[in-house]
A protein has these predicted regions:
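Short beta-strand or tight-loop elements
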Residues: 146, 157, 168-172, 208
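Short, conserved beta-strand element in jelly-roll/cupin
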Residues: 152-154, 165-181
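Short beta-strand His + acidic residue motifs that chelate non-heme Fe in jelly-roll/DSBH
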Residues: 159-162, 204, 210-216
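A short beta-strand-loop-beta hairpin characteristic of the jelly-roll/cupin
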Residues: 177-198
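Short strand-connecting beta-turns/loops that link adjacent beta-strands
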Residues: 181, 217-218
């Protein structure tokens, strides 16, 4: 699933150079408040702890054997794909990622990256879960789950190089719809080119620079999951505290509110269609 294009860095020093600290790689805010600057300093300090106390090191892309539960996720692929197919019947009504999480506008402003959240930042989407119970059952096998959604890349979509805002989580992709030809569809994480495969898991650290593209003429879909990075004490405790504090930040609260409004409209329209005479 991966092609190493350059020599691997050492685990510690190279990771410190390549990973995000604080707000590196994030569009700067105009005149950040004293509170914001204080929080950013804490995040930068926590990220250094996360690198030092990472339980399984800090590779850009992980060996799936590191996480034995990935086999259970892959076994659930046929049921997840069946539920996805039902969701895609209303693909045109699904929100673009930036409609939910407005900070995504720094890397995507079109309608070619759509989402269907089951859980975001630890908050469940009850109606979406009811629509995809087998998918929800599968992701419960992932320890310390934070986010799970269907990530839908339309033909021609290219997500530019960027870094995640914090290195306290890892990202999982399960290939659900992966069109051919494979060489026109990939994700680069640092210096590794990774190719999705249907029914196969890919785990990477989004704190490294990464970009993704779909240069085929068909839609690509993956199950997109964020889970807490396995850490040793004291980083594990600090990370837990920051994750809980982050829930109250304005951009996460805004995202949760945006999703709640979309969900309300989406299922109200579905109910109207069901109640239409002759439906």
């Amino acid at each position: 699933m991966t092609d190493e294009t350059l020599t691997k860095p050492t685990q510690s020093q190279a990771a410190k150079i390549e990973q995000t600290f604080g707000t590196d790689g994030i569009a700067p805010m105009a005149r950040p408040s004293r509170t914001t600057r204080f929080f950013m300093a804490i995040v930068a300090w926590a990220e250094k702890l996360n690198l030092k106390y990472a339980k399984f090191g800090n590779p850009p892309v992980y060996d799936n054997a590191t996480f034995p539960w990935t086999r259970e996720i892959e076994k659930a692929w046929p049921e997840i794909r069946t539920e996805l197919d039902r969701v895609l019947l209303r693909k045109n009504e699904l929100p673009a990622f930036q409609d939910i999480s407005t900070d995504v506008r720094t890397i995507s402003t079109d309608r070619q990256w759509k989402t269907f959240f089951l859980i975001g930042f630890g908050v469940k989407s009850k109606q979406n879960i009811q629509a995809c119970p087998k998918t929800w059952q599968a992701v419960q096998k992932i320890p310390h789950l934070k986010t799970a959604m269907f990530s839908i890349f339309e033909p021609g979509k290219h997500l530019p190089a960027h870094r995640g805002p914090y290195n306290g989580v890892l990202r999982l992709h399960l290939g659900l719809i992966v069109p051919e030809p494979g060489e026109k569809l990939a994700i680069r994480v640092k210096d590794q080119i990774c190719h999705w495969e249907e029914g196969k898991v890919l785990i990477f650290d989004d704190a490294y620079e990464h970009e993704a593209w779909n240069h085929t003429d068909k839609t690509r879909v993956v199950l997109f999951v964020d889970f807490v990075k396995p850490l040793k004490y004291p980083a594990r405790f600090v990370n837990w505290a920051l994750m809980n504090l982050a829930f109250f930040t304005p951009f996460i609260q805004e995202g949760l509110g945006n999703h709640k409004e979309w969900e309300k409209r989406f299922y109200a329209e579905a109910e109207t269609l069901r109640n239409r005479p002759g439906a």
